[in-house]
Design a protein with these regions (language model features):
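Bacterial Sec-dependent N-terminal signal peptides
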Residues: 1-18
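Transmembrane beta-barrel domains of Gram-negative outer membranes and organellar outer membranes
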Residues: 15-226
Length: 226
């Protein structure tokens, strides 16, 4: 019996410790001396411009690298991104994605694509609703992406098409550990050479769970396009 009581006490302590860690992490984000901000888990497929409820002075550099084997050549993707908040609740972003290609030895004479700066992407996001009491945030935003010609044909034309993407984000935290988020908006593609305009509509829904006592998340995302 004493052993059972001791084990029970140890488990209870561990649970309290993790709960306290979760609360401390949330309190660190939702500092009362600062403008209102709610901790939310962000999706991976969709890159938010800044945290929902961004505070003035926040800034961040991001670098990304990727490698894809295309059978006859390898493609290397590199991403440079800078995002910042010039004022409370307003986030801005500039992104430059590059793709570089390297032919393989046995490519059968297949022509390797030209290296390219894929696009220049500029974006803004305004958190128009942030409520710590109900742990809910909402934001509207706009992404404009100028897609460029590859380096071999650079300037002929320089901009091949324009992509317009207004969007809405709604996020809510349930208790300390459960998070949900919906990101949605139309994507309008304007082909400069043909003058054609194509429109699609995206919805990203995500559900995440913050592992107690850590800052790590596990979750699932659903991406739908019409």
């Amino acid at each position: 019996m004493p052993i059972v009581l001791l084990a029970s006490s140890s488990i209870a302590y561990s649970q309290i410790s993790n709960t306290e860690k979760d609360s401390l992490y949330i309190n660190q984000i939702e500092e009362k001396k600062q403008p209102a901000k709610v901790l939310h888990a962000e999706p991976l497929y969709i890159d938010l411009i800044r945290d929902l409820g961004a505070r003035k002075g926040e800034r961040e550099w991001n670098l990304g690298l990727g490698l894809t084997d295309e059978l006859t050549f390898d493609s290397y993707e590199a991403l440079i991104e800078y995002e910042w908040a010039p004022m409370d609740r307003l986030g801005l972003e500039v992104e430059l994605p590059f793709t570089f290609y390297s032919p393989l030895a046995d490519n059968g004479g297949v022509e390797t694509p030209s290296n390219r700066l894929n696009s220049i992407k500029i974006a803004t996001q305004w958190s128009f609703f942030v409520n710590e009491r109900i742990a809910t945030s909402m934001a509207i935003g706009y992404i404009n992406e100028f897609e460029l010609s590859d380096f071999r044909n650079f300037g002929k034309p320089m901009i091949s098409r324009n992509v317009y993407n207004p969007f809405l984000v709604v996020a809510k935290r349930w208790g300390n550990n459960f998070h949900s988020l919906v990101y949605t908006g139309p994507i309008i593609v304007h082909e400069y050479e043909s003058g054609e305009v194509h429109t699609s509509y995206d919805v990203n829904t995500s559900f995440h769970y913050m592992i107690p006592g850590t800052r790590n998340f596990i979750g699932v995302e659903f991406n739908k396009t019409w």
